[in-house]
Amino acid sequence: MLNYKIAIEGKENPLPIVTFEDSRYELAATFLLGEARNFGTEIIAALDEVCAGKKKTGAFAGNVFSLEITPETTTICDDISGKECEIETRALKKAAEEYWAEYRKLTEK
């Protein structure tokens, strides 16, 4: 499993920020910050359908990022810069669920 932490940053408009120990996953952290705030449930649902075996593959397209999901790995693509990152699908799902939970706590106050 991937090691990461979620910290709340900012005083006026606090946001959860994900930091992965391995810098190869920096794009995954940027994806969560950029897309999960608006599309948390959709991202988690797309990942869950593949993890649960309901679909063999899946996809998600947000404002800046897109996902190509397989049971083992998910490719995160920054559609503007063309940068890509491959991450374990289950690890991304777990991080997205935790990020979404933290974001909802902040916005429900």
Can you say where each PLM-predicted feature lies in the sequence?
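Amphipathic protein-protein interaction modules
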Residues: A45-E97
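The feature represents the first ordered module of a protein
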Residues: M1-F60
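Short, Lys/Arg-rich amphipathic alpha-helical interaction segments
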Residues: A101-K109
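Short, low-complexity, polar/charged sequence segments that are solvent-exposed and flexible
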Residues: A36-G40, K94-E97, L106
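Surface-exposed beta-strand edges and their flanking turn/coil or helix-capping segments
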Residues: T19, T30-L33, G82, T89-A91, ...
